[in-house]
From Swiss-Prot:
Comp. bias intervals (Basic and acidic residues): 358-371
Boundaries of every FH1 domain copy: 491-647
Family of this protein: Belongs to the formin homology family.
Residues with Phosphoserine modification: 370, 490, 502, 524, 527
Modified residues (Phosphothreonine): 499, 722
Protein name per Swiss-Prot or TrEMBL: FH1/FH2 domain-containing protein 1
GO molecular function: actin binding; identical protein binding
Function: Required for the assembly of F-actin structures, such as stress fibers. Depends on the Rho-ROCK cascade for its activity. Contributes to the coordination of microtubules with actin fibers and plays a role in cell elongation. Acts synergistically with ROCK1 to promote SRC-dependent non-apoptotic plasma membrane blebbing.
Amino acid sequence: MAGEEERGDGDPVSVVTVRVQYLEDTDPFACANFPEPRRAPTCSLDGALPLSAQIPALHRLLGAPLKLEDCALQVSPSGYYLDPELSLEEQREMLEGFYEEISKGRKPTLILRTQLSVRVNAILEKLYGSSGPELRRSLFSLKQIFQEDKDLVPEFVHSEGLSCLIRVGAAADHNYQSYILRALGQLMLFVDGMLGVVAHSETVQWLYTLCASLSRLVVKTALKLLLVFVEYSENNAPLFIQAVNAVASATGTLPWANLVSILEEKNGADAELLVYTVTLINKTLAALPDQDSFYDVTDALEQQGMEALVQRFLGTAGTDVDLRTQLTLYESALRLEDGDMEEAAAAAAAGGRRERRKPSSEEGKRSRRSLEGGGCPVRAPEPGSTGSASPVGSTPSTGSAPPTNPAFSSTGPASGLLRTSVNLFPTISVGPSVDSSCERSVYKARFLENVAAAETEKQAALAQGRAETLAGATVDDTDGSSGTRELWDSPEPASAPRTPQSPVSRILLRTQRSLEPEPKKPVSPPSPKAEPIQEPPTCVPKLCIGDLDFSDLGEDEDQDTLNVESVEAGKASPFLSSLSPSLSGGPPPPPPPPPPITGSCPPPPPPPLPPPATGSCPPPPPPPPPPIIGSCPPPPPLAAPFTHSALDGPRHPTKRKTVKLFWRELKLTGGPGCSRSRFGPCPTLWASLEPVSVDTARLEHLFESRAKDVLPTKKAGEGRRTMTVVLDPKRSNAINIGLTTLPPVHVIKAALLNFDEFAVSKDGIEKLLTMMPTEEERQKIEEAQLANPDVPLGPAENFLMTLASIGGLAARLQLWAFKLDYESMEREIAEPLFDLKVGMEQLVHNATFRCILATLLAVGNFLNGSQSSGFELSYLEKVSEVKDTVRRQSLLYHLCSLVLQTRPDSSDLYSEIPALTRCAKVDFEQLTENLGQLECRSQAAEDSLRSLAKHELSPALRARLTHFLAQCTRRVAMLRVVHRRVCNRFHAFLLYLGYTPQAARDVRIMQFCHTLREFALEYRTCRERVLQQQQKRATYRERNKTRGRMITETEKFSGVAGEAPNNLSVPVAVGSGPGQGDTDNHASMKSLLTSRPEDATHSRRSRGMVQSSSPVSHTAVGPSAASPEETAASGLPTDTSDEIMDLLVQSVTKSGPRALAARERKRSRGNRKSLRRTLKSGLGDDLVQALGLSKAPGLEV
């Protein structure tokens, strides 16, 4: 019985009682297995614990003969696979039926079985590694495997299973290919499988290649699958054409040659194959979106004698009715596309051929339908021969016959020219073709048409160009463009003779003007003398060390901001102002402060030094007076003014006690009149934060203080938490000590798996190499965990098990250690300083960091019941330690969720502050010592050079050494200046973050950067977890849309499923053992397939009678009962999926093309016709006039 145990604080702990079984499916081809044991035992699962931690206990309870690392949990009977990385509570949204059974008092069943990926890999290995009868048995069983587990289909597709089938089928005979086509047909019945075939063009190419097979059954099955593929979606027809062209290019044959060979009956094709072939061509042509693609397909067919084949079949008395219907549809589509409305009107109304759009400004090429059938001399039509051969566009459109050429409705200056070239060819009826002996006339006609088209386009372009010029001038004048207005309004036409008129020229002119140099201030010339060996010049050099630019460090940063604050506050001694602030050319010291003035107010207590007052203060009676520059600050008021009240809105008094955040509040005394900071327009970062609204009710519920309720529970229960300890104390202590300097365990695992060099340093990797678990330790821990699954592991044991769960741990650590084994001695001082300078800029301008601080401040103010202006950033170390009292999730987790809700475009913060994360690894105190040692070593090198100068040295060597030491001296002095200015900027940065001068002095750079780095690292890890959970939920919703769904349930084939009787349901997945319901469904499908369509009203996709033959039929258990060719004629299929496929094919072949007459095809050329229409029609009067040809007597054009 599923239950919920009561916790001491009154909240239920989600404990679910379920029944568990296992399924021995290590061999995917052993399809006769059933879940064991038959009487499923019960087990209690913790809903808040990840399932990966509970699977070992279930594995031991069942004694399953499965590998523990390959196990997965499947919900029965829905078949949903649970995510082992998540808990049941986290998957509650995906387990509605599971929890619905629990709410009814039932015990749902979980099945322990092999993971999908492992089973798919086993299938692929079996297919690749077997041959002969074993391969035949495997291919024969593959269809049933897809039937039994609907989740296996998408996994098989994603694991390159289609490529495996093609590779195996390419090297096999027609029997194996027949089994592969059966499995592929079952796979294509599922929406996931069909989408996989759509995305895998090699499968479509292979199916088209099989159309040239010598096996009639293989050809028929391939045609069926291609028919279903093309009919499934209109977008599949272009994919099929691409596959045909790819095969033709690879094999060196003509496109569509495989289908034409079937129509030529070279291999003795029967009427059924002919119907499937012509239907496939018609379905492909009906789905094409543009006219050029339509004519490309028809022209390729006509080149191979399609017209002669059509006439031969239509002229034969014994031609099959369905074949005659499909051939008539093909002829009607071609004539309708050419504009022969008289003969194709009835077929268009019945078949629903769409009309293609014919643009009016261009002339296109014609089809070559009559190249092989005989070309008549191109002639001009007689004046009196209009009748049925009248131009299509000469009559206005009516309701029943829309205009085939919209050129007559076009407007513009060129409409008159375009109207003359709309219909260049009369429409004639297509008859049987005769042999052609005048091929020159064909090319002559094509040449004359192109010449006429070029002349027409030239005239239209000139007219359109004039219109665009006038329109462009009007638009420019309306927009108020200064250049254009000057061009039109200028009284002197010769003032701008070269002003461009076209938009491109105007853009070039603006670009040229933008590139003209602007007047600049004169730059002082460099020193005329360059002495490389002498001391650097007296002018202040540019602060650049290698490729590191420190030039933004100004001279005003030579003085520490903290000392300035102390002087202004009266805390600095008078004699400190006389010290020199710089070394090597620094700015002069500031002037001493003026003597104290009588009447100045005393400083706030406690003063470390007697403050010298630098100005007078107003009398104290009124409330806080405005601060005067140079005067001492007034004592703090009783209640510090809240300068960021808009950040949190009105104060909400909490009704319950909440968990408190023990941060150190900042006492910000700056008001709105304070001067801006170097880092932003506001004096502090907190003043610039935007207000964030939080769900106070939810926070109050999550973080309600339960200290009074928890304490009695701890006293009543065990007073000490028990843990599973297996390691000896020495080993355990060594690991625990090592863990103090390493990141958290989950961070280490993620870093090792992703090779994240920022998460673990080189020292950490070397330490991990000494802490690797042995096989003996792993076995002991696993045995202890199985013996006590409810007792958590100790920290050392948990750490070792985490490392042991990483595959190839030793190899990873060694590889990583080698990768990080890199040091740059030359930049060991400059790079950390540059990183610190850049890191401060990155942190200040980071929008994610601001949002995190604002959100955390709003949450903390609500939980604390206060209105703090800010908090010290040192509290970021404790954010992950605070947990809510309901789900025991950390405050950092809720912070990530709130930030993602407020700012979905926010980043992970860690990747945007790489400079600060690098600074966290640098000891800046040691860096200062290294800088001093570098100065001493530089001076000692100079002394050594002087002593060496007394001995014999070549002048060139001496010059080189002198130049080298001079450069070193200059660079060391520059390093000293950079170090001083960067440190002073860091102190100013701390003041901007709200620190007081006294607190800023105690902050170490390394500790500050380390705090931010650890917080950013934990924030990134937690954010990835939140995003992963959101992605899994979204993936589950998308997966559920097609999970187990068959193509018969889609809108395209909905008519097929709707035709079935009420007692017949299309199965989602066929089971391995037939039952009474399956037998009834089977009989109902047989009666449906054998019934005539006249008995009931059918949709257009399923009209007609079912053919007696089927792709495959098996009555025995194994494939050895009969060959595929023999079973093809054995009658109706015995497999329900085969019946569904046959029903789909019959619905496609018995239905006409898609009713899309209201849509027009796109095309890039105008007035393109078929080859038959082009070569059998004469040139019209418009074309003859455009060419300048006169109709002299006896002259034929």
